[in-house]
């Protein structure tokens, strides 16, 4: 929705994202009252929140895509470019294992579909994947969870995650 009042009334919120960090933050900022509504409903109001791909990255303090840009600042960290090498393709695209590294009600081991060129580096990492070394697959705390992978493309694993999110009472 583009309506901050709908966000304020929402039972739970999903913030998807495809594209560049700055463009997505600019898109939120261009909707009068949207960032304030998200802050009020999610951080102050405790509504369950799921950020997907760039939606997860926006939870960070800073994104470094096309310069350094402020994110929502809900989870301490920066979003940095993945470094390509002859053995490592960027973007990271395809199926990879999701490996829990800290307890979280919604994250279980499994295989998910990833498509990204930037990765979160910071606090509150709850799952990683391997792409030439550990890469953040999910971040979370309290009532917020962000996943770098795409649940909507991750077949059974993604459907199960979305079902758990719909039942989640943090």
Regions flagged by a language model, labelled:
Residues 1-8:
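Short acidic low-complexity segments
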Residues 15-17:
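Short, well-ordered coil/turn residues at beta-beta hairpins
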Residues 19-92:
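Cysteine-nucleophile active-site neighborhood
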Residues 43-44, 77-170:
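Amide-donor transfer/coupling interface in amidating biosynthetic enzymes
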């Amino acid at each position: 929705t583009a309506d901050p009042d709908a966000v304020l009334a929402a039972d739970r919120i999903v913030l998807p994202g495809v594209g560049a960090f700055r463009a997505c933050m600019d898109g939120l900022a261009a909707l009068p009252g949207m960032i304030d509504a998200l802050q009020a409903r999610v951080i102050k109001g405790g509504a369950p929140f799921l950020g997907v791909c760039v939606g997860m990255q926006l939870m960070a303090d800073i994104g470094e895509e096309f310069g350094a840009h402020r994110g929502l600042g809900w989870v301490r960290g920066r979003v940095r470019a993945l470094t390509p090498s002859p053995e490592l393709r960027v973007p990271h695209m395809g199926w990879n294992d999701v490996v829990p590294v800290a307890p979280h009600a919604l994250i279980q081991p499994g295989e998910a579909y990833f498509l990204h060129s930037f990765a979160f580096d910071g606090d509150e990492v709850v799952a990683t994947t391997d792409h030439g070394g550990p890469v953040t697959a999910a971040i979370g705390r309290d009532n917020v969870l962000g996943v770098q992978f795409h649940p909507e493309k991750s077949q059974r694993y993604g459907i199960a995650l979305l079902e758990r999110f719909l039942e989640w009472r943090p």
